[in-house]
Regions:
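Bacterial N-terminal signal peptides that target proteins for export
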Residues: 2-14
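N-terminal signal peptide c-region/cleavage motif recognized by signal peptidases
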Residues: 23-25
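A flexible loop/linker signature enriched in serine peptidases of the S9 family
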Residues: 196, 322-332, 349-356, 372-384, ...
Length: 567
């Protein structure tokens, strides 16, 4: 792998006079990348890149660790994707990495190109795939696989040359949901999360037929269609179906050859069979735990509710929610279920439906008296803490130490926050002091550490979290490619030494373990789809006299079968 630096010259173009840093000698190369000036940019990007056999991986300040991972990952994933789509990469592709979603939003690359995709799938512009890091290597891997798959599929369908691309795109009239769905199918296996999204969509009663469904949710509809073809008509017929559609320029002909039916009939069967399957699934589910209050929000086509945070105080009728309307984010506080107060309005109005996966974040303190909110504005991570008793924002400040924050909870007092955050391209656990604007680092490695929560068991207190580290004691390498499943770990909270004790609480082989939390004085819970359905598992932690930590996971006793929206 070779390392290059890029120097900026001119306003509209990025010209790279790069010199290879190695003992053999210097090799000069030139690369031109178009940049516009239509979006507000809050920092200057000093671009560098790694060059491998098949990819140029571009990154900027604080992104070297991520780029190192992506460069190796792309080379590792390429052969399998080439084999699946039955086509090889013809020339070196470019991967442009942004450190997080908000800096991706500042990008002008390919802003005016009609075939740039938006809304859930990796953007591709002239053989440049654009990805971002949200702190989770699994999501980054999916984006890289999507980008590789789109590069290969676009070359198959439309050709490698730009002029040929535009001409063939006009001639080959395949539905966008079909091609984007195929790319997503190649990039990501069908999962319980996708299955839950499909179930919610089909049982909502909003869609008259498949075309209506594909118009509203094209990526989900396309991915589900190809998964249906694989299950009903064999996996090897997925790529063959797309090949026939391209050759004959007719979906009916391809459908007749593979399914022995017209294309519309296949789509009708898709809707009918899946609806019947999900109705049977609902009948077999356990009842929800009994509660005292149900909160129902009226949904609208132009409004999404992306985060819901109830007040933890007993018998409280207060909750906070983030509303998203065409690029604008509203943090809204509801008291007594009806009194509405907008605490924050941020974002820029746009028709693009790209919801920020990270911000705003909400968290209540243990007493339910203060609400913390972390959000992104004007190129900075910002924090405010709203006091429900005094009815004003006690804290309004920038959080300077971190590049992005994925998760936030209050510690035992209102002055400290427990964070999963990215610093120097690594996702780690931190305890952040609000008054001093400094932090204590709990973990420090290249593995993703997510979903932290403070727990207290008999003879043991600490921070429980989800991580893809292979071993509790291992220190991650910046050259490693994390591939392990997410499992639950417990870090000693009071050991301040460099070698903080970390215990492994789960050993999931086939699915990730996420969202751990304390259930009672002896049990913790987490979500996993180990058996193919997302269930909440329970386990308990005990310490023997010899000082050995023993973990007991109740693998067959599910507390409930939650829908994805409840996680």
């Amino acid at each position: 792998m070779q390392f290059y630096q890029i120097k900026l010259k001119g306003k509209a173009f990025l010209t790279a006079f790069s010199f290879l840093l190695c003992s053999i000698g210097a090799i000069s190369q030139v690369n031109t990348v178009e940049f516009g000036k239509n979006r507000v940019q809050f920092r200057k990007f000093k671009w560098q890149y790694y060059q491998t056999d098949n990819f140029n991986t571009y990154f900027y300040q604080d992104g070297q660790t991520i780029a190192n991972y992506v460069a190796q990952l792309a080379e590792q994933e390429l052969p399998g994707i080439e084999q699946f789509v039955e086509y090889s990469l013809q020339r070196r592709a470019n991967i442009v990495i942004y450190n997080h979603f908000d800096e991706l939003q500042q990008s002008n690359i390919g802003l005016n190109l009609d075939w740039q995709t938006t809304g859930g799938i990796t953007k591709l512009v002239n053989n440049k795939m654009i990805v971002y890091f949200d702190g989770n290597h699994s999501n980054l891997r999916r984006q890289v696989r999507q980008g590789i798959a789109r590069t290969l599929v676009d070359n198959i369908l439309f050709g490698d040359d730009l002029g040929e691309f535009a001409a063939n795109q006009a001639l080959l009239d395949l539905p966008k949901w079909l091609t984007d769905g195929y790319i997503d199918y190649v990039a990501e296996d069908w999962s319980p999360e996708l299955d839950d999204q499909l179930k919610s969509a089909l049982l909502s009663g909003e869609y008259k037929n498949f075309y209506h469904f594909a118009y509203e949710k094209p990526l989900l509809a396309g991915h589900a269609f190809w998964n249906y073809i694989a299950e009903r008509y064999k996996p090897e017929n997925v790529t063959y179906f797309l090949y026939l559609a391209r050759v004959y320029r007719n979906l009916n002909t391809a459908s007749q050859r593979i399914c022995k039916k017209k294309f519309k009939e296949v789509l009708r069967e898709f809707m009918a069979e899946n609806e019947e399957k999900y109705y049977l699934d609902i009948r077999g589910r356990r009842n929800f735990p009994k509660g005292t209050i149900s909160i129902v929000e009226e949904t609208k086509h132009n409004k999404d509710f992306i985060r819901f945070t109830p007040n933890p105080a007993p018998r409280s009728q207060t909750y906070a929610v983030v509303e998203y309307i065409k690029g604008k984010y509203y943090v809204v506080l509801y008291e007594n279920l009806v009194d509405r107060k907008v605490l924050l309005k941020t974002g820029v109005r746009t028709n693009e439906n790209e919801v920020n996966p990270s911000y705003p974040l909400l968290a209540w303190d243990g007493k339910g008296a203060r609400l913390a909110c972390v959000y992104w504005e004007a190129g900075k991570v910002k924090l405010f803490v709203y006091d429900l008793v005094a009815r004003f924002k006690r804290v309004k400040q920038d959080i300077t130490p971190f590049e992005q924050i994925q998760d936030m909870k209050f510690m035992l007092n209102e002055k400290s926050l427990l964070l999963s955050a990215v610093k120097n391209g690594q996702s780690d656990i931190f305890i952040y002091n609000i008054d001093k604007d400094d932090f204590e680092q709990v973990t420090n490695d290249s593995y993703a550490d997510l979903d932290p929560s403070f727990v207290a068991f008999p003879n043991k207190t600490g921070i429980i979290f989800s991580s893809n580290r292979p071993d509790p004691s291992i220190k991650g390498r910046d050259t490693g490619v994390p591939v392990d499943r997410f499992n639950i770990f417990l870090a000693d909270n009071y050991n301040k030494s460099e070698f903080r004790q970390i215990s492994r609480l789960t050993d999931m082989k086939f699915s990730d373990a996420r969202y751990p939390m304390q259930y009672n004085t002896s049990h913790f819970t987490f979500i996993s789809a180990e058996n193919g359905v997302a269930n909440r598992y329970a386990g308990f932690f005990s310490t023997e006299r010899a000082g050995l930590d023993t973990i007991y996971v109740i693998g067959d006793n599910f507390l409930r079968n939650p829908d994805q929206r409840d996680l």
